[in-house]
């Protein structure tokens, strides 16, 4: 709540990242949806959801129901939107294949992606047409105008995954002061970053 309130006070955005899944192994979609509700109830002016797709602890083409449910909740509040989707193959690597993590980092931090779609469902259907399943969906920005977003220092970022092992690499990219595994470009270290559990492995949130 403190991070959300801080972002609201500074006219920042609340970003929610997480594995949008009913699998319950690394996360649960209900937690993401409740975080949207929480941020809206506390007065957030803008909420951006970055959906990581499963297809491993769930059937390989099962994301549509989860995305539809979350989109419905976003529409209910009018200030929330799914702004990106990407498969867990990229966003949740745990074996130092940093080229995968970099794709997720660029998508979430700056909206840089291989693909752009007008809605999350459109993005998913396009991925299926390319032969991708949920786990392997390539980085896609969701935007009707193709305008890129950037996570700012005044924003709050909440990572909703509750299992640490596959959340660490992406978290390191976001919060490490001296991150060197790939070039983050001008992306600043995020100061208002929240983990829903202790991801360990030397991660320090200042």
Label each PLM-derived region with a short phrase.
Residues 1-206:
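…; additionally, a secondary subgroup of soluble metalloenzymes is captured
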């Amino acid at each position: 709540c403190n991070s959300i309130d801080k972002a609201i006070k500074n006219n920042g955005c609340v970003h929610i990242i997480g594995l949008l899944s009913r699998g319950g192994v690394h996360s649960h979609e209900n937690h993401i949806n409740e975080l949207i509700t929480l941020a809206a109830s506390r007065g957030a002016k803008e909420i951006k959801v970055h959906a990581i797709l499963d297809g491993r602890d769930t059937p390989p083409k099962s994301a549509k129901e989860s995305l539809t449910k979350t989109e419905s909740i976003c529409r209910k509040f009018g200030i929330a939107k799914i702004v990106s989707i990407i498969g867990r193959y990229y966003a949740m690597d745990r074996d130092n294949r940093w080229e995968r993590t970099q794709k997720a980092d660029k998508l979430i931090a700056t909206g840089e992606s291989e693909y752009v779609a007008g809605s999350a469902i459109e993005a998913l259907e396009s991925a299926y047409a390319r032969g991708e399943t949920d786990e392997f969906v390539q980085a896609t920005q969701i935007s009707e105008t193709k305008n890129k977003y950037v996570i700012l220092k005044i924003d709050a970022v909440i990572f909703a995954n509750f299992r640490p092992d596959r959340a660490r690499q992406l978290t390191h990219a976001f919060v490490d002061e001296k991150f060197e595994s790939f070039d983050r470009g001008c992306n600043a270290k995020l100061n208002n970053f929240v983990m829903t559990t202790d991801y360990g492995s030397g991660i320090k949130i200042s």
